[in-house]
Amino acid sequence: MTRTPVNVTVTGAAGQIGYALLFRIASGQLLGADVPVKLRLLEITPALKAAEGTAMELDDCAFPLLQGIEITDDPNVAFDGANVALLVGARPRTKGMERGDLLEANGGIFKPQGKAINDHAADDIKVLVVGNPANTNALIAQAAAPDVPAERFTAMTRLDHNRALTQLAKKTGSTVADIKRLTIWGNHSATQYPDIFHATVAGKNAAETVNDEKWLADEFIPTVAKRGAAIIEARGASSAASAANAAIDHVYTWVNGTAEGDWTSMGIPSDGSYGVPEGIISSFPVTTKDGSYEIVQGLDINEFSRARIDASVKELSEEREAVRGLGLI
């Protein structure tokens, strides 16, 4: 193995998602089974000891691809030479907290991290924001990194995409491997729109196969959009392993490419496609190749879809205005 190790930075590394993520990165699932990695674990000062415990366990796995671990509470150190950054750590919403308060609290995290990425990361840096509100946190980080191409900042909607795949597979009596071209549009929030109108199930149009708009509107979309809350209700804690899995999927697909005839969903800076205002970070259908992505163009958007895309995009535009008003972008 003569390849240069890839520097992967994970923030919130001692948290539940971080714990579910790090061992999979170290085993080669993030970038590939032949790609050595060095891990940088960024945590807040009180959590450094817990991060050290996780690092001890990583050492004890003796992963052949893992060529070093560094633990720090300094973003400038964590992002120095980083090739891939997974921004997992975020301020969760607590009871009685308004959305503006949440955005402001997260601005205090993602603005300094964006600046550190701007000043210290490698030229080929790829950023995935997992910590919620992911789309707008990604926008805050991106705005603080003017020297980094905007398209390198992405937000995770792959968890929603994966959730939608399974719900559609269950409804149609198929497997997730049978489903192609599903799309998540908009925000990673309850307004997101999982779109099956261009999807196929075993080669046949998914919407025609389902042929049940009531199920689509009353069951499928709410189940996918509110799945996170349902998991908290059932588990007593938020999605961790499934979120980590989606982060792995997102980066692996970004780096290694989508399958022929298929696409995926990523939260990316809009170029104005499909009437989504330029600059907001919204989920789109994308194909990826050689570490780059392109929005799938030319899809017909019916009235059912248009109304739902517009509602989610409106929320994203409002979030952008809120963080602009707070001086975060």
Swiss-Prot record:
<feature type="binding site">
    <location>
        <position position="99"/>
    </location>
    <ligand>
        <name>substrate</name>
    </ligand>
</feature>
<keyword id="KW-0520">NAD</keyword>
<dbReference type="GO" id="GO:0006108">
    <property type="term" value="P:malate metabolic process"/>
</dbReference>
<feature type="binding site">
    <location>
        <position position="132"/>
    </location>
    <ligand>
        <name>substrate</name>
    </ligand>
</feature>
<feature type="binding site">
    <location>
        <position position="93"/>
    </location>
    <ligand>
        <name>substrate</name>
    </ligand>
</feature>
<dbReference type="GO" id="GO:0006107">
    <property type="term" value="P:oxaloacetate metabolic process"/>
</dbReference>
<protein>
    <recommendedName>
        <fullName>Malate dehydrogenase</fullName>
        <ecNumber>1.1.1.37</ecNumber>
    </recommendedName>
</protein>
<dbReference type="GO" id="GO:0030060">
    <property type="term" value="F:L-malate dehydrogenase (NAD+) activity"/>
</dbReference>
<keyword id="KW-0816">Tricarboxylic acid cycle</keyword>
<dbReference type="InterPro" id="IPR001236">
    <property type="entry name" value="Lactate/malate_DH_N"/>
</dbReference>
<dbReference type="InterPro" id="IPR001252">
    <property type="entry name" value="Malate_DH_AS"/>
</dbReference>
<dbReference type="Pfam" id="PF00056">
    <property type="entry name" value="Ldh_1_N"/>
</dbReference>
<comment type="similarity">
    <text>Belongs to the LDH/MDH superfamily. MDH type 2 family.</text>
</comment>
<comment type="subunit">
    <text>Homodimer.</text>
</comment>
<dbReference type="InterPro" id="IPR022383">
    <property type="entry name" value="Lactate/malate_DH_C"/>
</dbReference>
<comment type="function">
    <text>Catalyzes the reversible oxidation of malate to oxaloacetate. Exhibits remarkably higher catalytic efficiency for oxaloacetate reduction than for malate oxidation in vitro. Shows a high specificity for NAD(H), being almost inactive with NADP(H).</text>
</comment>
<dbReference type="InterPro" id="IPR015955">
    <property type="entry name" value="Lactate_DH/Glyco_Ohase_4_C"/>
</dbReference>
<dbReference type="InterPro" id="IPR010945">
    <property type="entry name" value="Malate_DH_type2"/>
</dbReference>
<feature type="binding site">
    <location>
        <position position="113"/>
    </location>
    <ligand>
        <name>NAD(+)</name>
    </ligand>
</feature>
<dbReference type="InterPro" id="IPR036291">
    <property type="entry name" value="NAD(P)-bd_dom_sf"/>
</dbReference>
<dbReference type="GO" id="GO:0006734">
    <property type="term" value="P:NADH metabolic process"/>
</dbReference>
<feature type="binding site">
    <location>
        <begin position="12"/>
        <end position="18"/>
    </location>
    <ligand>
        <name>NAD(+)</name>
    </ligand>
</feature>
<dbReference type="Pfam" id="PF02866">
    <property type="entry name" value="Ldh_1_C"/>
</dbReference>
<feature type="binding site">
    <location>
        <position position="163"/>
    </location>
    <ligand>
        <name>substrate</name>
    </ligand>
</feature>
<feature type="active site" description="Proton acceptor">
    <location>
        <position position="188"/>
    </location>
</feature>
<keyword id="KW-0560">Oxidoreductase</keyword>
<feature type="binding site">
    <location>
        <position position="106"/>
    </location>
    <ligand>
        <name>NAD(+)</name>
    </ligand>
</feature>
<dbReference type="GO" id="GO:0006099">
    <property type="term" value="P:tricarboxylic acid cycle"/>
</dbReference>
<feature type="binding site">
    <location>
        <begin position="130"/>
        <end position="132"/>
    </location>
    <ligand>
        <name>NAD(+)</name>
    </ligand>
</feature>
<dbReference type="InterPro" id="IPR001557">
    <property type="entry name" value="L-lactate/malate_DH"/>
</dbReference>
